[in-house]
């Protein structure tokens, strides 16, 4: 099995505007919300290639529910650790090449431990894909502990 691990996934809110003027109300001409994050994108591509995978990592709140439901709707198996904080939202102004990334949720010690326990049960011969940024309060040594 292939496991894609997202420590700081997002809901990407992609909007298009005709113009962008400071100190003015700017109207969107289109909008789209999709699951985001490098490892989640890999899981989505694997699914399109007919390769099963399990998307895991941290998800919380309404945005986390949105991501999980979307992935399940696409036929991607999920096994995320539910967190108390809200999964981040990234804003992308499509035709202006502007990206504003949310910082991400705070992940408790217990939530981190739960993910590490899940990862410890991955079988030899399985593939792990770990991609993306770290949530703000997660120390980078978690990467060593995962590997």
Task: List each model region and its residues.
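Residues at secondary-structure transition points
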Residues: 30-37, 86-88, 106-110, 141
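Short, solvent-exposed amphipathic alpha-helical segments in soluble enzyme
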Residues: 19-22, 71-74, 145-146
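Conserved N-terminal subdomain of the carbohydrate kinase-like
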Residues: 48-127
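Glycine-rich phosphate/adenosyl-contacting loop at the front of the ribokinase-like
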Residues: 1-56, 66
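Glycine-rich phosphate-binding "P-loop"
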Residues: 27-32, 102-104, 131
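Conserved beta-alpha-beta core of the PfkB/ribokinase-like small-molecule kinase fold
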Residues: 127-147
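Cofactor-binding loop segments of dinucleotide-utilizing enzymes, especially the Rossmann-like FAD-
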Residues: 5-9, 58-61, 83, 133
């Amino acid at each position: 099995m292939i496991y894609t691990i997202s420590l700081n996934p997002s809901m990407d809110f992609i909007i298009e505007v005709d113009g962008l003027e400071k100190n003015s109300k700017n109207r969107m001409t289109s909008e789209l919300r999709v699951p985001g994050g490098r490892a989640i994108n890999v899981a989505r591509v694997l699914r399109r290639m007919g390769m099963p995978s399990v998307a895991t990592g941290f998800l919380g709140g309404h945005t986390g529910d949105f991501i999980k439901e979307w992935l399940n709707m696409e036929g991607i198996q999920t096994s995320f650790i539910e967190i108390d904080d809200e999964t981040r939202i990234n804003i992308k102004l499509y035709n202006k090449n502007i990206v504003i990334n949310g910082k991400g949720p705070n992940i408790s010690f217990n939530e981190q431990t739960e993910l590490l326990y899940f990862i410890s049960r991955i079988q030899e011969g399985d593939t792990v894909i770990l991609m993306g940024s770290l949530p703000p309060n997660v120390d980078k040594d978690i990467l060593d502990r995962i590997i």
